[in-house]
């Protein structure tokens, strides 16, 4: 019921006989409130440490304080000298936010798409926020879903030699500008020059070529959009810049910049430096190859660069501001359409050690280690994932500021958030640089603190939290997460008992999201056709003998799936054998699997668009980089096809009917 504060430098011969006046409590991190609490001397326990020159105050907690992040400041005067101290005080709820309908037993359905893979007649070869708004419309109108899951939108390099994995970004604080809808930006409408550039035959031909490419061409799309964004930024400055300080758009821009503070400053500085050195030192692909003077974000060389290149830095702040505006508009559309959740975001575990977050916040990482996984049956040598672990002590001493910032950013403009590898809140597997993965160790984190902070940001953002808890999970950890209101993440492929039998649909937990597969696993069509096993052989991951063993294991797994679907009443017994023998999912099998997922007691049922539309291609093939087209696969059906193609509309109608028959949806 009390907290303690120490005021340094207190004279050891001073008598304490006067009451302390006020304790000021300021809520930090984008909150602008200040509260003062007057305390009587009888409420304060005071003692003096003569040896250390400290005044120890024990003060009562205010009884009516709301959840939030506060900095408490205590100040007292002795003669002409003032003594003060402060401490961070974080007040957290017991559980994460739960939408009210969940408290009365509602269960809902959602569809998941990879935004980069959306095809449309309007986009520039990659899905954008205009497409996402149309996906939301289609999903609500045709599927009657309450949420749309999307891949992590984190900022990537969008260029070689870096990969395009949204799970190994340059920054988790900011987002990838390739998703911006250029034509929909306000400054595009105000820029005849930008409109003329887009209308040029060579630009239109380039856009059409990018649309028609089999895979997403991140680098060329980023180059094209960057050139247009620079023109739009010039238009913004001319029409609304510093000479128009009182214009509402400049005020909104400044409000965004100030609210993001040092985080956006360092991110934008990194991007500007990257552009600068790409011209000066084309072979310098990472910040570690820049001149040493630019390795520190707070060093004099960087400060000088910031002064001399203010507009280049403002440009990258402008880009993120525009992303924020467009993403907010998508979430608002989802809620207006009647969705309970709207966008379901995804927060990656990792950051690239060559990226903006690491450069800007080096003190918060351990560069001498990599995160990975210990040896197991899947990877006998263990796994080294290549990214650095966080410095848990420095992050804790900061008041968990970067941890909170990442949560806040990724909860923003959405109704649910998936935390990748949620075991990170408990531990990570650290591997010393240069050592084998088998030589790594598990390092514990401050789990209780981190879980409480997740609850806090979930409540403040009114965001449902899903914890990706696949893999090696500590004993009782799933139960602990559920007790905090964090939904578990359950996959149809993996939910099996000790005898390898598929679990009955009734045995799935209520506090969970259930799905068929993920971006790292074969789609239903790929699983049934052994496509993932074929790929492993083609890429030399397994030999012929191992391939045959995996195929036999898969045949047995498919038989167990058929048995469960028949037993639970989702697959007619007379079509079971044909479904098992078929090299592709039969219509009956597809219907049965979808119906099984929808009928589980789990609060959220999520179907990936690849599994709805029976696409054989998976988004990512673990253990590969250039050997497999990862994170570049475009959707089988275009945005226009979704409402007009007979096969697409038939499958959408099946989704809606099965979800409604299972009782999913709001009353």
What label would you give each PLM region?
Residues 2-13, 17-74, 90-360:
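Acidic/aromatic-lined carbohydrate-recognition and catalytic surfaces
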Residues 164-192, 357-381, 441-451, 486-498:
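Acidic, His- and aromatic-enriched active-site or binding-groove loops in soluble protein domains
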Residues 340-402, 406-409, 428-443:
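Substrate-binding/active-site clefts of carbohydrate-active enzymes
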Residues 249-252, 360, 462, 469-612, ...:
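Conserved alpha/beta catalytic core and glycan-binding cleft of carbohydrate-active enzymes
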Residues 319-337, 399-486:
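Active-site neighborhood of glycoside hydrolase catalytic domains
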Residues 149-160, 347-352, 420-425, 468-471, ...:
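Short, solvent-exposed turn/loop segments enriched in Gly/Ser/Thr/Pro and often Arg
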Residues 114-129, 215, 307-322, 383-401, ...:
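The substrate-binding groove and active-site-proximal loops of carbohydrate-active enzymes
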Residues 109-113, 146-150, 341-345, 417, ...:
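Hydrophobic faces of well-ordered beta-strands that scaffold small-molecule active sites
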């Amino acid at each position: 019921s009390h907290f303690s504060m120490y005021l340094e430098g207190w004279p050891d011969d001073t008598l304490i006989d006067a009451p302390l006046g006020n304790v000021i409590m300021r809520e930090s991190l984008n909150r602008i409130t200040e509260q003062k609490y007057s305390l009587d001397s009888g409420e304060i326990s005071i003692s003096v440490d003569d040896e250390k020159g400290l005044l120890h105050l024990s003060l009562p907690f205010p009884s009516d304080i709301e959840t939030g992040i506060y900095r408490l400041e205590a100040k007292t005067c002795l003669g002409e000298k003032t003594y003060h101290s402060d401490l961070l005080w974080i007040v957290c709820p017991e559980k994460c936010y739960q939408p009210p309908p969940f408290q009365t037993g509602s269960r809902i359905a959602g569809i998941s798409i990879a935004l980069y893979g959306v095809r449309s007649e309007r986009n520039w070869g990659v899905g954008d926020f205009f497409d996402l708004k149309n996906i939301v419309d289609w999903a609500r109108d045709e599927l009657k879903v309450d949420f749309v899951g999307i891949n992590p939108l984190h900022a990537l390099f969008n260029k070689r030699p870096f990969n395009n994995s949204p799970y190994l970004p340059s920054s988790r604080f900011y987002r990838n500008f390739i998703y911006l809808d250029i034509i929909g930006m306000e400054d595009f409408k105000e820029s005849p020059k930008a409109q003329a550039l887009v209308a040029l035959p060579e630009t239109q031909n380039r856009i059409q070529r990018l649309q028609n490419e089999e895979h997403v061409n991140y680098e060329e799309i980023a180059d094209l959009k960057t050139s247009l964004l620079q023109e739009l930024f010039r238009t913004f400055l001319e029409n609304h810049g510093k000479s128009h300080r009182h214009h509402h758009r400049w005020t909104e821009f400044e409000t965004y910049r100030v609210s993001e503070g040092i985080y956006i400053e360092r991110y934008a500085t990194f991007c500007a430096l990257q552009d600068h050195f790409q011209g000066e030192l084309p072979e310098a692909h990472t910040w570690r190859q820049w001149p040493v003077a630019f390795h520190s974000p707070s060093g004099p060389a960087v400060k000088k660069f910031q002064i001399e290149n203010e507009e280049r830095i403002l440009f990258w702040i402008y880009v993120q501001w525009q992303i924020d505006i467009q993403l907010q508009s998508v979430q608002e559309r989802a809620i207006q359409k009647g969705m309970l959740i709207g966008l379901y975001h995804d927060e990656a575990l990792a950051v690239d050690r060559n990226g903006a977050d690491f450069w800007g916040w080096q003190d918060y990482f351990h560069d001498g280690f990599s995160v990975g996984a210990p040896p197991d049956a899947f990877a006998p040598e263990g796994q080294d994932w290549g990214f650095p672990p966080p410095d848990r002590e420095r992050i804790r001493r900061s008041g968990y500021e970067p941890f909170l910032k990442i949560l806040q950013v990724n909860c923003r403009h959405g109704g649910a958030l998936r935390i990748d590898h949620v075991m990170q809140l408990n531990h990570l597997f650290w591997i010393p640089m240069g050592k084998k993965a088998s030589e790594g160790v598990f390092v514990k984190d401050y789990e209780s603190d981190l879980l409480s902070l997740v609850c806090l940001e979930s409540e403040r953002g009114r965001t449902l939290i899903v914890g990706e808890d696949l893999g090696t999970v500590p004993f009782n950890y799933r139960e602990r997460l559920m007790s905090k209101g964090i939904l578990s993440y359950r996959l149809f492929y993996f939910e099996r008992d000790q005898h390898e039998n598929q679990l009955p649909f009734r045995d799935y937990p209520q506090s969970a999201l259930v799905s068929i597969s993920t971006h790292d696993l074969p789609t239903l069509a790929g699983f049934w056709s052994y496509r993932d096993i074929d790929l492993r052989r083609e890429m030399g991951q397994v030999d012929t003998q191992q391939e045959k063993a995996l195929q036999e294991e898969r045949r047995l797994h498919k038989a167990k799936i058929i048995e469960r679907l028949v037993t639970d009443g989702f697959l007619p017994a007379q079509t079971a054998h044909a479904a098992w023998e078929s090299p592709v999912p039969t219509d009956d099998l597809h219907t049965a699997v979808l119906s099984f997922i929808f009928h589980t007691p789990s609060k959220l049922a999520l179907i990936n668009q690849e599994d709805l539309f029976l696409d054989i291609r998976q988004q990512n093939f673990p253990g590969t980089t250039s050997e497999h087209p990862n994170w570049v696969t475009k959707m089988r059906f275009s945005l226009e096809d979704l409402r007009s193609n007979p096969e697409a509309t038939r499958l959408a109608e099946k989704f809606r009917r099965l979800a409604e028959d299972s009782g999913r949806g709001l009353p």
